[in-house]
């Protein structure tokens, strides 16, 4: 059969498209392959069928239902292009003979448009609440045929193809259909199954691009491989109904919130005979080890450093490229969901670190995705982050706004995650963040605020409140931006909590001073109470404080070995008795000497030493006290929950305060930050009678010197510190006491 478009001067447009169209198809530059390929009516009840299958030896057409041969498609002058005419239009299969074997499948170009108009409208509007079930690779059934529907946003592309092992990564085989005006390309590939690796081959305005991973991928290959994978639907049999029903109450602002921050790949690992890391644990293996440990220590939540797929392990997850896919380093999405389910069944909440501020420049990722600045700002003064050599999301573009919003909801709704800690919020709020004059672009009002990011954060918090009731959204925000945790209808950003970076910097600076000089830094510990109720705060001792030459938490402490441990115990006790929710990074709970290294597990061998076991025991007891006694948690965010007794004894480096519950129950906290025991130190109290020691951080239980008050003290009718009564206490060296009245 000849495939000339002209025969004796007459055109045959029905059998063959124009030479120009065929040329574009062969060169993989045709914008509408469905206009050429697949079945096309002949106007008389029959159909023409065209298939472009480079490398195929022959193609037969079978009746889809009966499997009988209807005829063959003929090859002609254009290699790979097969066409045929059939007098009756009916559903069909293609039997394709390749050099390596035979393939029988439905024709991808025999299916109509797949995505609904409402899905496309909501996506373009930036308000699709379940985008991870719409775009990307979706296992689905079309006209009774199982397969995978691919959909990707690339509005400036001239052509997009799906490539993978299933088509030997040949972009000519599966070019996609463009859905105007959304800029979304789609294609259904029948009989494709879960687990297939794939990417997109994109012809941009300036030519072919490096193969791109799917921005909406639900699963990925194990790094350093970079392809996306077709993921099966999440089919976990959730057993956390009790947790989810009670979550809103558990995560109320007046409830205890004590967070154990960890990096999943370096908390514990399988090690070889030399003690070197042999492999990272899977989610199932982590659950077996981590959940009992966290539960025993009394933490209410864990916070995972980013587990979204990221190409570079040394970024700790803070440069993710797959905002919808858990990292393949630890298992499948199903495995991750099972891990969260297990945490919930044990009464432990799960918070994820989440990065909507920036993304890495890897060529297989989002950068110049369709040959243009699609996800990022086009102007480097807006779109390039100098500190991290990353690109900044253009959240002013509705599709990007909606992409990140959908990512947040994906984790909260599909995986039952209890909260998101939003990374690097300060870098989002300011256009001149870490930039010199002339290196940034003002907003439309001439100011430095990033109005698009502000709108996004407010919208995020409003939507999460509606779509994931009871979930927390927490801001890592290091500036004095007002109203971070204020409601959006009151002009705030709407976060549940803000990390108190000021408290962290001041308190760590103080505790690193030699006690001889602490009198000159006395206000550094008390200053945090000046603004403690301006936001709802979390007190963070995070991973950032134990890396990059900052020393581990215990190694920051001054003095000899005994003093270092005493300082650490006193600091942690001060933190747990201070207003604000708690966050502690892994390893700090037992005094690891080394800085954290993401390539090694924690130094668990240290727990053979009593001082390290003592710190661990103290953290467990602090958590139990914090959860048991309402004065330590139920008025964290209001000044009525705190009362200074002694804040000005700089000479002795002593502080004392009361914590009050909503019901009027007090606890007394007294801290001595010198190595000198203070005998007979008088402290005013509001209640007469016996006061029991709930905690002494110098107790022998924690490998301390056991100096103190024998577990109790009795009030005297002598006024002090604005109170009608007082206690005379022995203050242990470098220690904190917490006492409670018996009556």
UniProtKB/Swiss-Prot annotation:
PANTHER family: 1,4-ALPHA-GLUCAN-BRANCHING ENZYME. It comes from Pseudomonas fluorescens (strain ATCC BAA-477 / NRRL B-23932 / Pf-5). This is 1,4-alpha-glucan branching enzyme GlgB. It comes from the Bacteria. Catalyzes the formation of the alpha-1,6-glucosidic linkages in glycogen by scission of a 1,4-alpha-linked oligosaccharide from growing alpha-1,4-glucan chains and the subsequent attachment of the oligosaccharide to the alpha-1,6 position. Belongs to the glycosyl hydrolase 13 family. GlgB subfamily. One of its GO terms (biological process) is glycogen biosynthetic process. InterPro entries: A-amylase/branching_C, Branching_enzy, GlgB, GlgB_N, GlgB_N_E_set_prok, Glyco_hydro_13_cat_dom, Glyco_hydro_13_N, Glyco_hydro_b. It catalyses: Transfers a segment of a (1->4)-alpha-D-glucan chain to a primary hydroxy group in a similar glucan chain. Pfam families: Alpha-amylase, Alpha-amylase_C, CBM_48, GlgB_N. GO terms for molecular function: 1,4-alpha-glucan branching enzyme activity; cation binding; hydrolase activity, hydrolyzing O-glycosyl compounds. SMART domains: Aamy (SM00642). The keyword Lipid metabolism does not apply. Its EC number is 2.4.1.18. Pathway: Glycan biosynthesis; glycogen biosynthesis. The active site is at 423 (nucleophile), 476 (proton donor). HAMAP family: GlgB.
């Amino acid at each position: 059969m000849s495939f000339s478009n002209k025969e004796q001067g007459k055109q045959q447009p029905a059998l063959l498209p124009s030479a120009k169209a065929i040329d574009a198809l062969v060169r993989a530059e045709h914008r509408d392959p469905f206009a050429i390929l697949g079945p096309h009516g002949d106007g008389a009840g029959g159909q023409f069928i065209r298939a472009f299958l480079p490398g195929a030896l022959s193609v037969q057409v079978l009746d889809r239902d009966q499997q009988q041969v209807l005829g063959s498609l003929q090859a002609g002058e254009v290699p790979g292009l097969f066409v045929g005419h059939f007098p009756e239009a009916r559903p069909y299969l293609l039997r394709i003979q390749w050099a390596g074997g035979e393939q029988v499948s439905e024709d991808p170009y025999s299916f109509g448009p797949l995505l609904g108009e409402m899905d496309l409208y909501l996506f373009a509007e930036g308000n699709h609440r379940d985008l991870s079930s719409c775009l990307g690779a979706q296992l689905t059934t079309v006209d009774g045929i199982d397969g995978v529907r691919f959909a990707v946003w690339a509005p400036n592309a001239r052509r997009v193809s799906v490539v993978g092992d299933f088509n030997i990564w040949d972009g000519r085989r599966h070019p996609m259909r463009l859905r105007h005006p959304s800029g979304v390309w789609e294609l259904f590939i029948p009989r494709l199954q879960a687990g297939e690796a794939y990417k997109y081959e994109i012809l941009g305005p300036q030519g072919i691009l490096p193969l791109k991973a799917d921005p909406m991928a639900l699963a990925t290959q194990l790094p350093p491989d970079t392809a996306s994978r077709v993921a099966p639907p999440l089919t976990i049999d959730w057993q956390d109904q009790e947790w989810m029903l009670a979550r809103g109450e558990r995560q109320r602002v007046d409830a205890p919130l004590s967070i154990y921050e960890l990096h999943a790949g370096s908390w514990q690992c399988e090690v070889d005979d030399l003690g070197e890391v042999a492999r990272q644990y899977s989610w199932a293996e982590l659950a077996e080890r981590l959940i009992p440990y966290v539960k025993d220590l009394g933490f209410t939540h864990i916070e995972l450093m980013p587990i979204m797929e990221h190409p570079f392990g040394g970024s700790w997850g803070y440069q993710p490229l797959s905002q919808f896919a858990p990292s393949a380093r630890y298992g499948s999405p199903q495995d991750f969901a099972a891990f969260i389910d297990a945490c919930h069944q044990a009464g432990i909440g799960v918070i994820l670190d989440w990065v909507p501020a920036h993304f890495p420049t890897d060529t297989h990722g989002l950068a110049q995705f369709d040959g243009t600045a699609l996800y990022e700002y086009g102007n480097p003064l807006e779109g390039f982050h100098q500190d991290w050599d990353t690109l900044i999301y253009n959240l002013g573009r509705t599709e990007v706004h909606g992409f990140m919003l959908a990512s947040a909801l994906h984790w909260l709704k599909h995986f039952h995650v209890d909260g998101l800690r939003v990374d690097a919020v300060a870098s989002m709020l300011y256009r001149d963040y870490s930039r010199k004059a002339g290196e940034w672009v003002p907003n439309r009002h001439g100011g430095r605020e990033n109005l698009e990011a502000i709108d996004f954060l407010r919208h995020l918090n409003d939507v999460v409140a509606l779509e994931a009731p009871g979930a927390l959204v927490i801001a890592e925000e290091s500036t004095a931006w007002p109203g971070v945790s204020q409601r959006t209808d009151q002009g705030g950003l709407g976060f549940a909590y803000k990390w108190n970076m000021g408290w962290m910097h001041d308190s760590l600076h103080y505790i690193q001073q030699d006690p001889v000089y602490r009198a000159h830094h006395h206000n550094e510990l008390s200053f945090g109470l000046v603004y403690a109720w301006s936001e709802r705060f979390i007190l963070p001792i995070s991973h950032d404080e134990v890396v990059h030459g900052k020393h581990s938490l215990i190694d920051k402490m001054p003095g000899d070995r005994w003093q270092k441990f005493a300082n650490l115990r006193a600091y942690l006790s001060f933190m747990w008795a201070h207003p604000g929710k708690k966050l502690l990074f892994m390893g700090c709970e037992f005094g690891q000497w080394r800085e954290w290294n993401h390539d090694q597990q924690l130094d668990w061998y240290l727990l053979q030493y009593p001082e390290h076991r003592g710190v661990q025991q103290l953290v467990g007891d602090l958590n139990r006290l914090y959860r048991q006694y309402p004065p330590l948690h139920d008025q964290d965010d209001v000044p009525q929950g705190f009362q200074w007794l002694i804040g000005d004894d700089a000479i002795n480096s002593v502080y004392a305060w009361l914590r009050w519950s909503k019901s009027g129950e007090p606890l007394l906290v007294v801290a001595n930050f010198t190595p000198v025991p203070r005998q007979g130190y008088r402290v005013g109290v509001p209640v007469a009678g016996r006061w029991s020691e709930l905690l002494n951080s110098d107790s022998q239980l924690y490998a301390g010197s056991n100096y103190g008050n024998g577990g109790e003290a009795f009030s005297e009718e002598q006024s002090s510190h604005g109170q009608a009564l007082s206690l005379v206490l022995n203050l242990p060296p470098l220690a904190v006491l917490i006492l409670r009245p018996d009556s």
